Amino acid sequence: MQMDPGPQVPLYWLGFVYAALAALGGISGYAKVGSVQSPSAGFFFSELAGLDASQPSRNPKEHLSSPVYIWDLARYYANKILTLWNIYACGFSCRCLLIVSKLGSMYGEQILSVVAMSQLGLMKN
């Protein structure tokens, strides 16, 4: 007798592709410039993107890592704006903040508590 696996949730392949591209971007940044900051940021953000893509595929109600990921990405690019005054980083950071505000209006206080907990280091695995 076969067991029923339950409802199947499709994998978020776009998130996994983005995670792979972010990691490759970090590697190519290291190869071109020789900066250690580029691969570390690439691997960090690709890890967060992979986590964000795999969570809803296991449980469709878990979408809370996406705002934390976008917030950290916006904070990273905001730091680049302050040090380099790069226009691309400014536009990308503003776009990330708009996405966070849109998700904030959809999910309300749930997102704000998760972001606050992640900033304080209170998130548990």
Curated annotation (Swiss-Prot):
The keyword Nucleotide-binding does not apply. It is found in: Membrane. The chain crosses the membrane at residues 9-29, 81-101. InterPro entries: TMEM14, TMEM14_sf. It is a multi-pass membrane protein. It comes from the Eukaryota. Its main location: membrane. One of its GO terms (biological process) is regulation of heme biosynthetic process. Belongs to the TMEM14 family. This is Transmembrane protein 14EP. It comes from Homo sapiens. The gene is TMEM14EP.
